[in-house]
Amino acid sequence: MNTTALLIGLGPLLGWGLYPTIASKIGGRPVNQILGSTIGTLIFALIYAWVQGIAFPSGMNLWFSILSGIGWASAQIVTFKVFTMVGSSRAMPITTAFQLLGASLWGVFALGDWPGAMDKVLGGLALVGIIIGAWLTVWSEHKDAGNARTLRQAVIWLAVGEIGYWAYSAAPQATNIGGEEAFVPQAIGMVIVSIVYALFLASRGEKLALVEGVSYTHIISGFFFAFAALTYLISAQPNMNGLATGFILSQTSVVLATLTGIWFLGQKKTTKEMWVTIGGLILIIAAAAVTVTI
């Protein structure tokens, strides 16, 4: 692995690692966050496609790419909602764990990954490790019935949201185009969801997010997400880091997302909780490394 490949591979660490913290810091409602983020992603994708001269896909390639973006935006709305319940430092390790579980199980049952018996044993142990790691990140030294109930609700919401993240990853596999070509249609799907969501909430009496300034401030956070998505696509190419190594490098973003949430958003933990959280993060990343190297 050369220095250029490594730096590109760490792009998602910065982009996806800082994205939830920046979005939470800017504030606003989940609808403001998703609207600005998706507009920022679309602007970034359009500029990149124009600079690189990337053709716009058509037919089923176009529709599956848009579906992919719809899946991500739908899931991200759920994730933003959970941020308001338990904070990004708790939500991010859980949603990362669900995404790893979903991607691994989809690979096994739909794509034929882990074909041997030993592969399945190692993979199963890795999935257990991911679950334990996620649990460690939300462990609380001082038990509180109200907090425990809220956390259970958050976990259920994130489990439902995983359906959207799964669609984001799985839909492009039904196309015969590369990730860079799918980037703009994905962003279009994301914006469609955010606008529909904003109009739906407005019809129920909430202020229309399209006329709120904070929505457009969130374009900044959208640039961070788009930067991460693009550098991951480049990193995963065979002449860079390859899919397996690129994926592992991208998952390090959960560490930055969790720690910046604690340090900059006031999502406090005791010393013991902090050490347990770090242990959980290490376990999640180690288990992710196992799943892609089997």
UniProtKB/Swiss-Prot annotation:
Q: What is its main location?
A: membrane
Taxonomic source organism: Lactiplantibacillus plantarum (strain ATCC BAA-793 / NCIMB 8826 / WCFS1)
Gene name linked to the record: rbsU
**Which residue ranges run through the membrane?**
5-24, 34-56, 61-80, 90-112, 121-138, 153-170, 182-204, 214-236, 243-265, 275-292
- Fetch the CDD domains from UniProt: ribose_uptake_RbsU
Q: Which domain of life is it from?
A: Bacteria
Q: What does this protein do?
A: Could be involved in the uptake of ribose.
Transport is among the record's keywords? yes
- What GO MF annotations does this protein's record show? carbohydrate transmembrane transporter activity
Q: Give the signal sequence positions.
A: none
List the keywords (alphabetical). Cell membrane, Membrane, Sugar transport, Transmembrane, Transmembrane helix, Transport
Please give the family membership noted in the entry: Belongs to the GRP transporter (TC 2.A.7.5) family.
Protein name per Swiss-Prot or TrEMBL: Putative ribose uptake protein RbsU
